[in-house]
Amino acid sequence: MSKKENNTCNTCMSDLTRRDFLKVSGAITGGLAAASAVSNTALASSGGGDIPLEDQKALFYDATYCVGCRECELACKEDNHLKEENVDDLSGNTFTLIKLYQSEDGGESSFRKYQCMHCVDPACATSCPVGALEKTDEGPVLYESLKCIGCRYCMQACPYGVPAYDWSQAYPLIAKCDLCYDRHDGPACATACSPGALISGTRGELLKIAKERIAANPGKYYEDRVFGEHDGGGTSVLILSAVSFDKIGLPPLTEKAIPHYGETATRAVPYIFGGAAGFTAIVYRATMTAEERQRLGKKQGKEEGETE
């Protein structure tokens, strides 16, 4: 455990009152049992509620149109007020990332946009013991930080390796793309994409566009199919590529919905926490009010400032 993690846990436990301790102690037994018995179907909405799948919000990425300009990355950071950083993977300040695949002989290459795939039946939501991740009726998979207990089951459950832990915060939480859920003009990345590699719309509309491109260009696209139409039960982010999907970082999935990926994570309870002591701190954090979290965060920030 890092020094920062130790400081966080120590501060949490030192602020416990007798009433808090009894509250936490009482929650441990029930919490361990409840988390271990999370249903694989109770927490995730598999069909997007009352809105038909074809009418839900989606994003289409055609890798053959992408020139690697990274306008999408910049737009995402600006719209979400994220810090600039030079990273090679998704993080608490990077929700989308353009990477380049190139074969060893240099004869084959392709760009690939990494981000949350917004699964039709998301394993991350199914694996979350407190319902901090939810598949909305409109399509995007959203994250509610106030519910999060920092267990990181979603990170284990996601077959795309998307959820990132934001260690820069006083309370490390999960961070990921929300498909610009509340943005009227659609995802910022798609709006900024001048080459036309990104298009936003309904899932039905985008599938039609993708299939029209396949039909108009026989042999151009890998397997003449759209990744995400059926893979892992389907996703709200649809992808076309000229090279095999595994070469651009997409996992080989069947058409079966993927919540079963969350089974491994939920079975790991409570060992991920390092035993009951670690779980105590996690449960305490989960039972804190927003005001308590803010107060402790300010205290921690002050202490860190004094040590610098």
Can you say where each PLM-predicted feature lies in the sequence?
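N-terminal secretory signal peptides and thylakoid transit peptides that target proteins
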Residues: 6-29
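C-terminal segment of N-terminal export signals and the immediately downstream linker at the start
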Residues: 15, 36-70, 286-308
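Bacterial N-terminal signal peptides
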Residues: 29-35
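Iron-sulfur cluster-binding cysteine motifs and their immediate structural context
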Residues: 41-42, 46-49, 67, 71-90, ...
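Interfacial juxtamembrane loops and adjacent helix segments
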Residues: 94-103
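Short, solvent-exposed interaction modules
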Residues: 114, 174-175
